[in-house]
Amino acid sequence: MTAMVLRSTVRSEYAPEVETAVKALFAALERHRPRGVRYASYRLADGVTYLVVLQIEDGIDNPLPAIAEFREFQENLKGWLAAPPIPEQATVLGDYRS
């Protein structure tokens, strides 16, 4: 299984909007419950840098673009960014969830 790690830094004046939009996005994920997806969002200590970790099970097409709130978040993020996002592919070596 692979993962996408995305690091984004937003302009400080948009941080509250980002946080509100992240909550709306996760509410939509809870409603839609897409299978085979692990999606996590983190805010770093500086308050303006965010990490997203996306894992999609092998053999599954990414279902997130079919969710309107995900598309809206992606579109709005373009205007909130202070710098281009940094995406990186990662290989999952272990993943424990209780």
Where do the PLM segments sit?
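Active-site-flanking beta-strand signature of metal-NTP-handling nucleotidyl enzymes
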Residues: 1-9, 51-53
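Short hydrophobic/aromatic beta-strand element in the GNAT-like acyltransferase core
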Residues: 3, 38-39
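Short, surface-exposed ligand-recognition loops at beta-strand->loop->(often short) alpha-helix junctions
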Residues: 9-20
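Short amphipathic alpha-helix segments
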Residues: 20-29
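An amphipathic, aromatic/His-enriched active-site/gating alpha helix that lines ligand/cofactor pockets
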Residues: 28-37, 54-88
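Short beta-strand micro-motifs enriched in acidic
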Residues: 42-44
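A short, glycine/Asx- and small/polar-enriched loop/turn
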Residues: 46-49
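Short, low-order "capping/linker" segments at domain edges
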Residues: 91-98
